[in-house]
Amino acid sequence: MGTLQPLGAITEEGFDAMFDVNVKGLVFTVQKALPLFQEGGSIILNASSAASMGAPGFGVYGATKAAVRSFARNWSLDLKDRRIRVNAISPGVIPTPGYASLGLFGEPLQQFIAALVINIPMGRIGEADEVARAVAFLASDERSHITGIDLAVDGGMIQV
């Protein structure tokens, strides 16, 4: 969940709503599901490239996703005795219905995406199936020695 909240226009209600969904909701969902996880399982958290790069109006959203990155690192230690791997995935610009929460539709959305594509080394936005394949990669038992990472699926955007 994310809405544009530039500094000076951040409301306490908007701030709380974003942290309630992206941070508090995540913590208590994972905690509630924890007894269901088998030893050697895998938890993959949904972070965002917004945690690693600045963008106007994305300060609060980016902060919530930085918290998600931190959870992956810390929870991988909390769950090491159960050999449960915890990783995060950070999608870049991926067209999803979530853009509606930003109030971006039609031409303004296309302009927003075009401005971001300029800084993506792969020269294009990503697709949802590319993120899904990255999640499957992390979830695989063949990746049993990967934990605590934040895998960027963003065409290299946050690396440059």
Residue ranges of each PLM-predicted region?
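Residue(s) in the substrate-gating loop at a strand-loop-helix junction
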Residues: 48
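Substrate-binding pocket helix/loop in short-chain dehydrogenase/reductase
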Residues: 6-7, 11-16, 116
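Short, flexible catalytic-loop segment of classical short-chain dehydrogenase/reductase
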Residues: 86, 91-102
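Short C-terminal tail/terminal secondary-structure segment
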Residues: 53, 136, 147-160
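Active-site loop immediately N-terminal to the catalytic Tyr-X3-Lys motif
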Residues: 7-8, 53-59, 81, 123, ...
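Active-site helix of classical SDR
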Residues: 30, 64, 72
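Alpha-helical segment proximal to the catalytic Tyr-Lys
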Residues: 35-36, 77-81, 144
